[in-house]
Amino acid sequence: IGFCTGSVSIEARLQFPHLAVISFEIRPEGKELMDTNSRRFGAPGITAVTGDFLYTDLTPFARPDAVFIGGHGGHLEEMIEKVKQVLHPEGCIVFNSVSAESKEAFCRGIERNGMVLHPSTHIALNEYNPIEIMKATLS
């Protein structure tokens, strides 16, 4: 969700060619970026959906077993609630937190939806721009 240039979707498709990758981006120009980049890197078959994820009908899509939230536009908790409604029972949500505020919002969304937060992974090449990779499941 929030595919931007498509880098995470493309890498997922390259690493797991059998994977059905469905990506969402609010900005309409994201579709062209995704198409260009998926061709450039040899990762065909990614379904790119543009528009506001919170208002997107998800019924045409298979239940996801993994969801990566890359962009949330300040609506992270609402996104988590919507994802929980369609997430496969054994599925997970992954989020890269780059600020204390986004970490807190993810934790609140997970707690409010009765999900389980797993231990996170911290990545930092230096003291600038640390990333916390967070994961949650239904149980």
Locations of regions flagged by a protein language model:
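Helix-to-beta-strand junctions that scaffold the AdoMet/dcAdoMet cofactor pocket
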Residues: 16, 86-89
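Conserved beta-strand signature within the Rossmann-like core of class I S-adenosyl-L-methionine
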Residues: 90-98, 102
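Conserved SAM-binding loop of SAM-dependent methyltransferases across substrates and taxa
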Residues: 5-18
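Active-site capping/gating segments
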Residues: 102-139
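A short, conserved alpha-helix within the catalytic core of class I
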Residues: 74-82
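Short beta-strand element of Class I
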Residues: 18-22, 93
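Conserved S-adenosyl-L-methionine
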Residues: 2
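S-adenosyl-L-methionine
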Residues: 24-64, 68
